[in-house]
Amino acid sequence: MASIEAALAEIKRGVEELIPEEELIAKLKEGRPLRIKLGADPTAPDIHLGHTVILNKLRAFQDLGHDVTFLIGDFTGMVGDPTGKNSTRPPLTREDVLRNAETYKQQVFKILDPAKTKIQFNSEWLSELGAEGMIRLAANQTVARMLERDDFKKRYAGGQPIAIHEFMYPLLQGYDSVAMETDVELGGTDQKFNLLMGRELQKANGQKPQVVLMMPLLVGLDGEKKMSKSANNYIGVSEAPSEMFGKIMSISDDLMWSYYELLSFRPLEELAQFKADVAAGKNPRDIKVLLAKEIIARFHSEADADAAEQEFVNRFAKNQIPDEMPEFTFAAGTPMANLLKEAELCSSTSEAMRMVKQGAAKMDGEKVEDAKAEPAVGTYVFQVGKRKFARITIA
């Protein structure tokens, strides 16, 4: 194992909150492999880069020699996590959950080492609780405590219904930590209430409380909202290499550093050197290319990463796209013709429609086919003719 100082530095990389750090240091000083848990309810079949932020941290614990368990919430997935929701989630069938779980396993092993990963399902112990066990579990908390949760508080104040089983969700997730005697649990910042519930239940059951490590939510391609499919600002881990490459290259230079910190496995010293290089005048685009290739190689292959880079170069570099160009931001739902006019690439929507019809308007190197089309959320390079360019963000 690495020294405690080196291990702690790697563990804390990109972390939003660590509760409490002194307990983690004490556990590391015990010199044994710690039991690390990450739970996920398989509510959707595919994961995107936002999901991988925590998986990367789990991999870091593996590389440091700790015992890692990826817990699939097949039981809690049928209950439905109410976190951040303003209405009750529709329950999933067991068939839905198990089908999604199989896809999850295939995708997480692109990051985690299969030989060092234990996969468990929480139905193993939650199904055995029975009515008496559920009542005893519920007795650990009060309705007042549950209403401290921001999402429950808002729904209660707004007269929105809260189902009784939703109150049980944090307790069930917390009980997972009791059943597994977890040392450290990972989660997103939106999971704080549930993660701390694990600490409380472990104390109530005579166990040492787990350390809670929370990772920030990855900002999506729009540079504003968290990455999600609903916001259409995501990069799926199963997307084609060329699609992934183009999307990563579209993020802002400032956002690139956040992606490096949360998605890259490069040493911290190397990232510091990258920042120094950019400060000294190196083009951030070159650094962004390395990020895109690293991520594509992880989910596809190095050959795919090289091919995606070459395709990108062929599409953009040969069009002689300038590094500097006007930048604009428009709301989602804006038609192509309006974008071209408002970005001053055309004098009017009529001219914009004419340019599209003539094949003279391009978006990311591809001809715009429909002047009424509405681009998805993201950042694109628009070109009209040979010399007019604009970088447009749809948010």
Swiss-Prot record:
Enzymatic class: ligase
Report the residue ranges where the short sequence motif 'KMSKS' region is annotated in this entry.
Answer: 226-230
Q: Which residues form the S4 RNA-binding domain?
A: 334-394
Record SUPFAM superfamilies: Alpha-L RNA-binding motif (SSF55174), Nucleotidylyl transferase (SSF52374)
Give GO cellular component annotations, separated by semicolons.
cytosol
Where is the motif ('HIGH' region)?
42-51
Q: Name one GO biological process term.
A: tyrosyl-tRNA aminoacylation
Q: Which Pfam families does the entry mention?
A: tRNA-synt_1b (PF00579)
Q: Which InterPro entries match?
A: aa-tRNA-synth_I_CS (IPR001412), aa-tRNA-synth_Ic (IPR002305), Rossmann-like_a/b/a_fold (IPR014729), S4_RNA-bd_sf (IPR036986), Tyr-tRNA-ligase (IPR002307), Tyr-tRNA-ligase_bac-type (IPR024088), Tyr-tRNA-ligase_bac_2 (IPR024108)
Where in the cell? Cytoplasm
Checking Gene3D superfamilies in the record gives: HUPs (3.40.50.620), RNA-binding S4 domain (3.10.290.10), Tyrosyl-Transfer RNA Synthetase (1.10.240.10)
Q: Which UniProt keywords apply?
A: Aminoacyl-tRNA synthetase, ATP-binding, Cytoplasm, Ligase, Nucleotide-binding, Protein biosynthesis, RNA-binding
ATP-binding among the record's keywords?
Answer: yes
A GO molecular function annotation here is: ATP binding
Residues bound to ATP are 229
- PROSITE patterns the UniProt entry points to: AA_TRNA_LIGASE_I, S4
The entry describes its oligomerization and partners as:
Homodimer.
As for what it does, the entry says:
Catalyzes the attachment of tyrosine to tRNA(Tyr) in a two-step reaction: tyrosine is first activated by ATP to form Tyr-AMP and then transferred to the acceptor end of tRNA(Tyr).
Question: What family classification does the UniProt entry report for this protein?
Answer: Belongs to the class-I aminoacyl-tRNA synthetase family. TyrS type 2 subfamily.
Full protein name? Tyrosine--tRNA ligase 2
Q: Which organism is it from?
A: Vibrio vulnificus (strain YJ016)
Identify the gene encoding this protein.
tyrS2
